């Protein structure tokens, strides 16, 4: 089973991933971008602003995703693999491009391999504003609430278009309730 935890910054992905590591100690935990040796370099290039063009940046992330599928997902196809982000985030954050075109490119990069289960932690604009006010913000978070809510909406649209098993969870719920919902969704004891 290939599971992806998705959500905009401050949605609680890291918290839920920490809980999942305790709940499923034999699972393989990974992340996109940067889940492989090459991926770490590509991520640094993309996030470090080395690519001056948004198209070049997108292709760096596609290269990372292709490597991630080959190095992590395919060799562990009979295991539980839980990823912090996936193709969904890659498509959503490349918001200057059409979703359908990005899906085509990502299916090439992933050899048509998609997560079997996608969990999206959703925030309302009000909850996002509160969470952002409680921390120092990185460059993406500094783009503002409207930007992040737009990304979240693109995540939802992408998930629906990919037509994979998914669940949208209100990220303002209690941490324990979210964890229980995720565990039930994965239906793995």
Curated annotation (Swiss-Prot):
Nucleotide-binding keyword on record: yes
One GO process term, biological-process aspect: dTTP biosynthetic process
Annotated GO MF terms: ATP binding; dTMP kinase activity
EC number from the UniProt entry: 2.7.4.9
Keyword Metal-binding set for record: no
Reaction catalyzed: dTMP + ATP = dTDP + ADP
Classification via Pfam families: Thymidylate_kin (PF02223)
Cystine crosslinks: none
Keyword terms: ATP-binding, Kinase, Nucleotide biosynthesis, Nucleotide-binding, Transferase
Its biological purpose: Phosphorylation of dTMP to form dTDP in both de novo and salvage pathways of dTTP synthesis.
Protein name, per record: Thymidylate kinase
Source taxonomy: Bacteria, Pseudomonadati, Campylobacterota, Epsilonproteobacteria, Campylobacterales
Underlying gene: tmk
